[in-house]
Every structure is written in C-alpha cells, then in structure tokens.
C-alpha cells in the first residue's frame, strides 16, 4: 500500500484517480507521497520514506526545494492547470482598475433605503466614471502559461500588448499571438504601457522587481496588477507612487496590512486560482504526476529534479537513482550492474543544477543486494527499485 498524505483539501476528482493500491488518508509521518496546495512545509520534519511531493498549483515557495532534493524527494507542480482561472482573474482586475465598479456597488449599498435610488443614481454615477481598456497599452511581464493567455485575451479585447520574457520557451512563443509586441528590455514596458501585469515566479532575482526605479519610469496614471507572487512589488514604494500620481491603481491578489484599505489599492483575497475548474485541473494533474513517478519512475514537471520520462518499463527490471550531478557516478552505477551480472537494456540520465536522475531498465530483476550497493556509491542520494 502506498501512503498519500493531503496537507490541504484536494479535489475529489483528482483523488479518485488513485487505485486501490493507494491510501489517500495517510498520516504525514507515514507518507510515501504528499499532495499540497498552500500549506507551508519549510519547518516540517520530512519522513524518511517520503518519495515525492506534488503541489496542486504552480508556485512552490511553500516547499523547501533544496532540502527535498538533498533527501531525494522529487517535487512536482502543475504548470498551466490553473492558467485560465488566473487569466480571467487578471482580466477582471483590468476592468476593476479601469471602471469604478466597486465604488458604484458601495454607493448602491449605502443608499439602498433611498426611495428614489434610481433617480439619485443618475446624479451620482458621474463620480464612478472610468476609462475603457480598448486601445490602451498593456505590458505583460512573463509569458509563461498564464502570461501568454493574458496577452492573447487582451489582444482580443482590443488592447495593444507588449510582452517581456527573456526566458520565453518555444512552446510559449508558438502559442502567443503574433500581434503581441516582443520587448527585449523591461524598462520599455515601464515607460510605454498604461497597464502592467506581472507573471513571473518568486526568485531572488524577481523579488521587489517592481520598485521605485520602475515607478519613476512609468507614465502618470499607470495601473499595476500583481496576481503572481506577493514579493514581486515593493509595496511601500507603490503606495508612494500612488500618492504622487505615477500609479493610478494597484490591484493585488495578496492581502496584507501594508496595502489593505489604502487609497488607490484594490486588494483581493488570493482568488486567482480559486475556481472549481482550476482546483479540479490541478488535482488531476498532481495525482497523475505522482502515480507516474511512483509506478514508473518517470519525472514530469518537477521543480527540483530534471524531467526524465522513460515511459512504461517493458524490461524485467527498472531502478531509479537520485544522485548528485558529479563525474563518474554513471560508470559506478553500471559497474555495480556488471559485477552482478545484470544486463542494462536501456538507460537515461538527466541533470538539473547540482542534482541528477538516472533510470536503468535491466534484463533481470534488481535484488536488494544490488540496490544496497548502488545506494552505497558516493554521491547517490536515493535508490528505488520500481520493478
């Protein structure tokens, strides 16, 4: 029985994909695999038998990636599974920042007892007049799964879209509208655009990237939208930019005491991926990733180990090895096999930074003694006999 612990509520449509060989109600201390959404894992003591963690979502800043890699725990995420939900959320943010719908709604609530509210509304509505987004310039920083959807949707709404992503993948480029103007210097986004939306991960290089220097380059009355990660925007600096008129509105999906209730700021309670469809998609994708890894040893959509997809094993045996990305380990792995008289039918090795992953399909079964000898090799982190 394979024990799975769910640190957060995971959609049943995903959990239903586990076969009878899985126990999806296991305690964390007994878990072979973990499903998580937002639970913070940095201070958790990870079980020795833990093989994998799947994040039902894209961001993984709540998971200790390096610690997991050191223990041979493969961490997965579900890129793109919630992309449409976040895209729609960003479009809503664009409209909320352009048309004072929230102010209008509040006026109606405050005047609900007015017998002539319809007549009064005709006089009051001029206070909530806004601007149309059609024809305006939108800068999209980050053109991954979400950013490209936002860019394409904004084109359909008649906006002039500028996209910046120095790491743009080939697949993302193919999916991007040809009408999106590719920008090679992010400063051009700051200088040219009426609206700016951010879609990058939280890295040391991106923390506080939207800062005073960026605001100083912006046009008067720029709208900034952050539905990506809370640390990307220097929020004290953006409050100053709002006071000076550089920024007309700041829409953020990350509530905190700095921005909540501030003039010119629309704070949403982290609703970007909070749709039934997104939660279902993320759960299904996360469970499939876990099963593929546990049952076949394949790594797809990992964030701390290299992707390595060898399909279903058709040989007599398959062993997988998480190891350090250092010279001579491959020769040592094959030497152990050769000394044991085990023929290697096929082998794949992939690396990512300091870590690597090897899959060996063999002509005969892998014994416990062979697995132990593989584990004893210097630099090997975890050995698992899959078949």
Please give the residue ranges for each predicted region.
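An N-terminal-biased, well-structured beta-alpha scaffold segment characteristic
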Residues: 1-79, 211, 217, 223, ...
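Rossmann-like adenosine-cofactor binding region
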Residues: 39-45, 166-259, 274
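Phosphate-binding beta-alpha-beta segment of Rossmann-like dinucleotide-binding domains, i.e.
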Residues: 79-137, 301-303
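Oxidoreductase and adenylate-handling cofactor-binding alpha/beta cores
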Residues: 87-106, 154-159, 285-298, 334-338, ...
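Glycine-rich Rossmann-fold phosphate-binding loop(s) that bind the pyrophosphate
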Residues: 143-144
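N-terminal Rossmann-fold NAD(P) dinucleotide-binding loop
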Residues: 147-148
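Rossmann-like dinucleotide-binding domain for NAD(H)/NADP(H)
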Residues: 212, 220-313, 357, 387
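A conserved regulatory-domain signal marking ACT and ACT-like small-molecule sensing domains
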Residues: 300-387
């Amino acid at each position: 029985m394979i024990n799975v612990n769910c640190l957060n509520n995971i959609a049943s449509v995903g959990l239903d994909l586990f076969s009878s060989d899985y126990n999806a109600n296991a305690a964390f201390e007994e878990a072979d695999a973990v499903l998580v959404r937002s639970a913070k894992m940095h201070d958790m003591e990870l079980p020795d038998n833990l093989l994998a963690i799947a994040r039902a979502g894209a961001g993984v800043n709540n998971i200790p990636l390096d610690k997991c890699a050191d223990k041979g725990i493969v961490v997965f995420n579900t890129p793109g599974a919630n992309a449409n939900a976040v895209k729609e959320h960003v479009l809503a943010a664009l409209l909320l920042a352009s048309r004072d719908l929230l102010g209008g709604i509040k006026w109606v609530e405050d005047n609900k007892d007015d017998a002539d509210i319809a007549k009064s509304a005709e006089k009051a509505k001029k206070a909530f007049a806004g601007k149309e987004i059609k024809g305006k310039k939108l800068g999209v920083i980050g053109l991954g799964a979400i950013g490209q959807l936002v860019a394409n949707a904004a084109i359909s709404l008649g906006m002039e879209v500028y996209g910046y992503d120095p790491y743009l993948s080939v697949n993302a480029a193919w999916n991007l509208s040809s009408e999106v103007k590719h920008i090679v210097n992010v400063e051009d986004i700051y200088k040219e655009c009426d609206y700016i939306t951010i879609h990058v991960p939280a890295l040391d290089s991106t923390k506080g990237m939207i800062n005073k220097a960026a605001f100083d380059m912006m046009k008067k009355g720029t709208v900034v939208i952050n539905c990506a990660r809370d640390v990307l925007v220097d929020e004290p600096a953006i409050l100053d930019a709002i006071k000076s008129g550089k920024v007309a509105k700041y829409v953020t999906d990350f509530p905190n005491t700095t921005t909540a209730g501030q003039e010119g700021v629309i704070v949403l309670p982290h609703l970007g991926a909070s749709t039934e469809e997104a939660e279902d998609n993320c759960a299904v994708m996360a469970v499939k990733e876990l099963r593929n890894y546990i049952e076949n040893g394949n790594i797809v959509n990992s964030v701390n180990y290299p992707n390595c997809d060898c399909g279903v094993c058709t040989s007599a045996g398959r062993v997988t090895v998480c190891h350090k990305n250092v010279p001579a380990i491959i020769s040592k792995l094959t030497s152990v096999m050769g000394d044991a008289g085990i023929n290697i039918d096929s082998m794949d090795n992939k690396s990512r930074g300091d870590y690597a992953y090897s899959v060996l399909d063999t002509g005969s079964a892998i014994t416990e003694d062979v697995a132990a000898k593989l584990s004893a090799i210097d630099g090997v982190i975890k050995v698992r006999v899959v078949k």
